[in-house]
Amino acid sequence: VTEGVDGVQVDLLVQEQISCLHDYTLTVSDMRAIEKADVLVMNGAGLEDFMGDALAASDAAVIDCSEGIELLPALGHEGHDHDTEYDPHIWMCEESALVMMNNILHGLGALDEKNLDCYRENAAAAAALVPEDDARMENLACPYLITFHDGFQYFALDNGLNLLKSIEEEEGAEASAAEIQEVVDLVREYEIPAIFTERNGSEATARAISRETGCAVYQLDMIMSGDGTGIQPYLDAMQKNIDTIAEALG
């Protein structure tokens, strides 16, 4: 949206590729970046709860990218202390990502009216790159999805997949024996050929289930960060997720 606009510098707060932001802690450099920022573009929907104190101390304008998006209830997980009411992983649906981009367009346009036309042109060019729905998703041999990350609800809904089970694993909060047995039972009942981990997360439990049931283990990408070069790397990552699903469940 900001490409080619003089005087606008975009920096990513969370630059590392991580599996989960639930327990992210702001670094000293993060705090400095927030203090210097004129505008903070946030995912919203509770994803950046870790920024509460920093936001209260900041004079920056805030653009909430989740405005206008119908949010799904957060998935509950045994033994996990996530207080978010709604699932914040809205960018995992390309239609929602376009709404997010539109929110950025309107937010920046209101703050910087002289460059509104440029923001509009950039947003339109980016939107034109979003591909049509992949027909392979309509003809999968197995439409059932089991993931080891709680962020694939929007992705599943957008692609006509039935998310049977989502296990959120992180340090100090591994899957329980009951959750593991539930996944084993589901794999056998629905004859599921593959289960999915997040590429920056642990595969240990999924591999154990694979040995027990014979199902394959594939990786999906939550795209928690990027290189700041525009929409194409995001679209490439989403396409790779689609290709992975088609290979694993097709």
Over which residues does each language-model region extend?
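Extracytoplasmic metal-acquisition and chelation regions
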Residues: 1-250
